[in-house]
Amino acid sequence: VWIVEFIGGSKSSRAVIRKGQPHLLSATSSRGEVITILDETHKPAAGSAIWFGGRRYECDDKGRTLIPFSNEPGKRTPVIETTDGFASLANFQHSTESYQLHAGIRLDREALRPGAKATIMVRPTLTVAGQPISLTRLEKVRLVLVSTDLDGISTTSTVSDFKVASDREATHEIRIPNRLSRINIR
């Protein structure tokens, strides 16, 4: 930072000249917002910190720190503090901790014959704040099958401790009941 003063003709002017400034990168993780502080050469600024929400968040040796999710999402303006004593304002989008579980489920129509065995394939995805995260965060996963016969009588079957993985489909084999009218898989 330089302060330049020009004086001439009984007038003076001052200018503050700043060459570069720290800025931040924000990425959503499963635990919150990972903030990386970069210096004016776009390299991680180890030892820097962020003042946000009345708290000081210290950065690690890679210039990263974790800010927890918010109950009120939106654009936020923290203060970046560098190791050489400078401070600067920055902006980032603060997300809320909202989980969503979606699943692609496939059951071959050709296997829906009375008494036949059919394989249900399930491919779930779990997201937090719109970012995919590992399925290992799920506990007590179960598959619920509701079959309804031609008389309108429904039968519910639950598969407890249903094993799911991020890299492959989970499968479960069922026997198709007689007089099946509809099957609902959850």
What are these regions (language model features)?
Residues 1-186:
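N-terminal, cleavable Sec-dependent signal peptides of secreted/periplasmic/extracellular proteins
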